[in-house]
């Protein structure tokens, strides 16, 4: 019996940020963690010595400076946690160009598959679903020279999907990132 889809394991995040002429990015993120993501956040939060240590770890992982941090449902028995944070991040500036990764908060910062040998199928502990919407406002007088291309990827069986859509409307860059991963990665049969 497959029990992997009993609960919803999801992160839904909205990021609103402003890029300043000096390359400073300021903004806020509102994220809802559900299921195993909420359990993992609780585990990491309580493993830290205090909230300051947790925030310091978050700043290091995300390469940001947290200005304000708040959670809801962290201390209750609930399948979800809501996290609010105000942040600052420095983009790379070269002369009058500002280089920005529109994915301010990365879904994956390093590959989890680091073993030299792997046996397929790979079994993941739970189904993952990440949805992140980012709205970046560029500084007045600046123009976007190049945007990454939209990307849609999926496995042959359609079980794992990554969608990365990016567009510009006026001085706002909109990024929608969706990743859905199920619990098995199988070897391709020829």
Locate predicted features.
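A sensor for short, sequence-defined functional sites
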Residues: 1-186
